[in-house]
Amino acid sequence: NTVSSFQVDCFLWHVRKRFADQELGDAPFLDRLRRDQKSLRGRGSTLGLDIETATRAGKQIVERILVEESDEALKMTIVSMPASRYLTDMTLEEMSRDWFMLMPKQKVAGSLCIRMDQAIMDKNIILKANFSVISDRLETLILLRAFTEEGAIVGEISPLPSLPGHTDEDVKNAIGDLIGGLEWNDNTVRVSETLQRFAWRSSNEDGRPLLPPKQKRKMARTIESEV
């Protein structure tokens, strides 16, 4: 159920944190660790549960499972699970950099938050993202950001810590909303090759998204009206 799932997630995060404290984690591992911490705090607040207490309970659940699990069953489980890959357009610095908006606009779409600076006009913009892929489909979006040619961040799509879980279609719709909002101000938006392949296939050869004018106007109005 929801509580036991949260307890197990807390304990597994604790194990991963101990691993990271020994300087054994790579950049994607550390990135997920930091973002999962925010997610757990949000879930704990929503459920009204203390994270330390939940971690202890999660440890007991995991220990009970390990006692009952045979080595052979564990091997079969691992083999049968499809492998996920972590893909990165952005460096750790690009992901963790703070940014500010002169004319902030924000929309919540399901478990995703879309933010953009409406003051940005007549710029060439590229969308970059870090996310995991499983069976050639986007599994989990970690973070998507919109960059100008000068490297300034002007937009972002991020999962809400208190509402975990989204589909590749949710991400694609959010990308469409962000593109529509940026193009409303006569910006030229391109999508990274990685995003084109796994999350946004409606692009021409140079990576520019193909959005009808009516759809662009609708998306821009949607972002503006929901702030």
Swiss-Prot record:
PTM per Swiss-Prot/TrEMBL: Upon interferon induction, ISGylated via host HERC5; this results in the impairment of NS1 interaction with RNA targets due to its inability to form homodimers and to interact with host EIF2AK2/PKR.
Chain location of the short sequence motif Nuclear export signal per the record: 134-143
UniProt motif (Nuclear localization signal) ranges: 31-35
Region (CPSF4-binding): 177-212
Protein location: Host nucleus; Host cytoplasm
Key words of the record: Eukaryotic host gene expression shutoff by virus, Host cytoplasm, Host gene expression shutoff by virus, Host mRNA suppression by virus, Host nucleus, Host-virus interaction, Inhibition of host innate immune response by virus, Inhibition of host interferon signaling pathway by virus, Inhibition of host PKR by virus, Inhibition of host pre-mRNA processing by virus, Inhibition of host RIG-I by virus, Inhibition of host RLR pathway by virus, Interferon antiviral system evasion, RNA-binding, Ubl conjugation, Viral immunoevasion
Renumbered residue ranges of the record's region Disordered: 206-227
Molecular functions per Gene Ontology: protein serine/threonine kinase inhibitor activity; RNA binding
Any Gene Ontology CC annotation: host cell cytoplasm
InterPro entries associated with the record: NS1, NS1A, NS1A_effect_dom-like_sf, uS15_NS1_RNA-bd_sf
Region (PABPN1-binding): 220-227
Single GO biological process annotation from the record: symbiont-mediated suppression of host cytoplasmic pattern recognition receptor signaling pathway via inhibition of RIG-I activity
Pfam families linked to this entry: Flu_NS1
Major localization listed first in the record, in broad terms: host cell
Source superkingdom: Viruses
Subunit annotation: Homodimer. Interacts with host TRIM25 (via coiled coil); this interaction specifically inhibits TRIM25 multimerization and TRIM25-mediated RIGI CARD ubiquitination. Interacts with human EIF2AK2/PKR, CPSF4, IVNS1ABP and PABPN1.
Family: Belongs to the influenza A viruses NS1 family.
Record's protein name: Non-structural protein 1
Organism: Influenza A virus (strain A/Tern/South Africa/1961 H5N3)
Lineage: Viruses, Riboviria, Orthornavirae, Negarnaviricota, Polyploviricotina
Name of the gene encoding the protein in the UniProt record: NS
